[in-house]
Amino acid sequence: MDGYEATRIVLSRIQSLDPENASKIMGLLLLQDHGEKEMIRLAFGPETLVHSVIVKAKKELGLMNCSRSPWSHQDELISPKNNRGSSLNPASLPFYANGGRSSRDLTNDFELMDDMNSRSTDFLGSVHARSGSCVLDGLGYGGDSDLGFGGVPCSYFARGFCKNGASCRFVHSDGGADLVGSPSRIELLRSNSVPPRLAHHFMTRSSLPSFSTKGVNLQQNDVQRAAAALMIGDELQKLGRWRPERIDLSAMACPASRQIYLTFPADSRFREEDVSNYFSTFGPVQDVRIPYQQKRMFGFVTFVYPETVKSILAKGNPHFVCDSRVLVKPYKEKGKVPDKYRTNQTTERELSPTGLDSSPRDVLGGRGFYNNTQDVLWRSKFEEEILELQSRRLMNLQLLDVKKHFQLNSPTNIHSPNPFSQSLISPRPLSVIKREYDGGEKGKGSSKEGSDDDTMNLPERLEDSLPDSPFASPAHHLLLFADSADNNGSDLWSPSSDNDDNSTPSTLSDSFNSFNYQMPRLPAIGMLPGRGGPTCRVGI
């Protein structure tokens, strides 16, 4: 256990026995400079030992009789001539060496210690003669601190992460350890006679350099004496200009409520120290950060208390720092979308239903509606059937377009069918005409005619668009077209020629052999079902 922890325990034990005079008694003990071991012994000693220390300290402070005013006694304590017990030898301590000594002997022992240590004399004299900032500079708590004494705490590290890491010029340390382990610094803030910068430095400077053990002990003793001298007199609060309250730990846990956002012109030339000096008139400043920018136009100021931020915002804008116009805004952290909200959005998106006309790959949206794989297979099979029906319908429309091209007696070759042909908009009446050719000048065979409007008419004058080469016959083209359609699962028609007079040259009729072609039966899509389909014997 270190001296700070022991001091905290002793202070708590004294407060439990005498809460009104605990700060004064603790200040006297710190001025007497008992040492770490004796403070630890007092922290873990019996209750009677602590009670005897309280009684003796109250007698020394003059709190037992009311004849002496507290102001005169404080002058005796702080005065270099009458300061008592600045350097006590632990071996000669009446509290610890012999608990059975009389109070008269103890008083004589205290009266013998009138000589004050030179370091304490100089330091306590400087408390009255110099300002608080000069005192801190003498102790190594200066702002620039060339020797490396202490440092301003990093506000980013206090929030949880600092991007600069070990190369950061601010101190990465947990300030809570100092607040808990150093009651003298907490009590120091209660004194209204302390300037804001003095209180701020006592709160934030966490450690002293360890050049040598003797130097560390000297500096710790000076800090303890300064704290004790400032917290002995609670009446000094009436003379102070700044009256801080107790530390609000809830406000310390939420740094956003203790920060403000500054905006200023790019041509401003003030430094962070100037900003700290200006805003310290409103309350204690913990940190000032002006990030590096090409044209610096904003910064952040962190205060010790959130009430300081409220008072600054209530004053309004503008503020002037070194003749530069500064605007103050409340600091707001960037909003973060909670993971729970994002998860709910993803779940709702996955559970959104899809229609039957969706793609087969769009099963991700409706995955939550299927309990097993059979439902998924049934859905995919059903969609495949719909796609097959649509492909058959498209094939029928293409054949209708081929029919329209033949009816227009086009002298050129057959063009690629257009599914968006005008024949779909205004269809003509359909009829089935079957005629038998016997070639050349042979007689005409019998033919069947049907006038059903729901049946498909075969293409007319197919011979007019025949190519010159016999190897590119339309019959061969239609057979290949029918085979490719059969592979896709579709049923096709086979066109036959229309036997008009003077439509087919007689010279071409002898070059081909006649053959019979069985047309496949059409499904019930736009046509009436036939028994076997018409048989067309083409003889050209």
Swiss-Prot record:
Signal peptide: none
Entry-linked InterPro entries: AtC3H46-like_PABC-like, AtC3H46-like_RRM, Nucleotide-bd_a/b_plait_sf, RBD_domain_sf, RRM_dom, Znf_CCCH, Znf_CCCH_sf
Domain RRM: 258-334
EC number: 3.1.-.-
Entry-linked Gene3D superfamilies: 3.30.70.330, Pneumovirus matrix protein 2 (M2), zinc-binding domain (1.20.120.1350)
Annotated PROSITE patterns: RRM (PS50102), ZF_C3H1 (PS50103)
Sample GO molecular function, one term: mRNA binding
Organism: Arabidopsis thaliana
Ranges of compositional bias, category Low complexity: 490-511
Span of zinc fingers (C3H1-type): 148-175
Residue positions, PTM Phosphoserine: 451
Basic and acidic residues bias locations: 337-351, 436-450
Protein name: Zinc finger CCCH domain-containing protein 46
UniProt-listed Pfam families: PABC_AtC3H46, RRM_1, zf-CCCH
Enzyme class, broadest EC rank: hydrolase
Keywords annotated in UniProt: DNA-binding, Hydrolase, Metal-binding, Nuclease, Phosphoprotein, RNA-binding, Zinc, Zinc-finger
Disordered as annotated region, ranges: 337-365, 436-469, 490-514
